[in-house]
Amino acid sequence: MLEGIVRESIGRKSSKALRRDGYLIANIYAKGFKNINAAFKVNDFIKVVKAKTTLPFEVKIADKTYKVVVQDYQKHPVTNALKHVDLRIVLDNEISHYLVPVKIVGVAKGLRNKGILVQSKRRLTVKCAGKDLPNEFVLDVSDLDVNDSLLVRDIKLPDNVSIVENNSVAVVGVSTAQ
């Protein structure tokens, strides 16, 4: 479980001091909750996010435990270091919008025919309750030939989960090499 501290002051000066000490600035929020300004050790945060097996993970701040998902993050443009992260509290019975990653498996037939695999959507916005939140969408691209694509409507959805994106948007496809 990831443990963090509550930030008392939210100004620029204190944020810079925390970053200098190896902390990642975070905002934790949900509908009906007061925003929590927190900070986590950067290395601990990265380890937990890489090792997690489900989309939501637990954080502990000020003796309270929250189940959260990463809603947004900011990186430094040159060093690529994490600067800020927004975490959304997952409420089991509250319907909300979440970003779910798309995982590609298999080797497309079109790659052997001089095609290029193009993934246009890395995450899809879904609307569901926290208890129904899928960990990821797994798409098998083995049957895709050149100029074929998988659309949002081709994704098999669990019960009580709907995708907010337009049904005719391509998620992954094989295009011809130029």
From Swiss-Prot:
Which range is the signal sequence, renumbered to this chain?
Answer: none
The UniProt record lists the keyword Ligase:
no
Q: Name one GO cellular component term.
A: cytosolic large ribosomal subunit
User: Which is an annotated Pfam family here?
Assistant: Ribosomal_TL5_C
Q: Where would one find coiled-coil regions in this protein?
A: none
Q: Which UniProt keywords apply?
A: Ribonucleoprotein, Ribosomal protein, RNA-binding, rRNA-binding
Tell me the GO BP annotations in alphabetical order.
translation
> Does this UniProt record's set of keywords contain Cytoplasm?
no
Q: Name the source's superkingdom.
A: Bacteria
GO molecular function of the protein, one example? Answer: structural constituent of ribosome
Task: Report the Gene3D superfamilies cross-referenced here.
Answer: Ribosomal protein L25, beta domain, Ribosomal Protein L25, Chain P
Say what the protein does: This is one of the proteins that binds to the 5S RNA in the ribosome where it forms part of the central protuberance.
Subunit composition and interactions:
Part of the 50S ribosomal subunit; part of the 5S rRNA/L5/L18/L25 subcomplex. Contacts the 5S rRNA. Binds to the 5S rRNA independently of L5 and L18.
Q: Which family does it belong to?
A: Belongs to the bacterial ribosomal protein bL25 family. CTC subfamily.
Task: Report the protein name in the record.
Answer: Large ribosomal subunit protein bL25
Provide the gene name from the record.
rplY
